[in-house]
């Protein structure tokens, strides 16, 4: 894949054209960090939501890529970061879900600290709570990988599983997420010869996830970076 990803830039222009036709009490953008948002900011109360700087995704993907052709494709795909680095410092009001993300935004995007407000994400403790009727499987590990990308760190969990199987043959890993067919993770699982010990679960309801946590003995969070790690508090709540 050698294409780019122009959507953040083009979305900004489309949003400005559409939103300029009406008056709004407030306009909130989620992570496009585009030139169009600066135009919107001039005429409207405006907030930019930045979950975390996508520069982290780029760095980890680049480090995990070996072939020159694939490295070039990563530079092209993440070319929108140049725009975001220019736009972000000019945004007056930014909301982010954690102090870790706030630090990342300051360091990576050179934003002013007083322009950033931290509002933690919440979790419904009634939806994610212990299920006393389910006995945890002593050999079941569980992790979440919302995307088949290096940032999620699934490689480390899989390699650790390979080592653990030598001492605990029954041990297995449940992954909440969908494996990309023919992708890096599938190839790694085959290379490690652990296909019979890794189970991917996707399209789950919140109750399904709750039951999987309840049936597991250890929850693994192997992400290399998270702006706000939902799997951590979900696992702790269950």
Annotate each PLM feature.
Residues 17, 71-94:
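Membrane-proximal helix-turn-helix segments that form the acceptor-binding/catalytic region
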Residues 185-207:
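Nucleotide-activated donor-binding/catalytic signature segment of Leloir-type glycosyltransferases, i.e.
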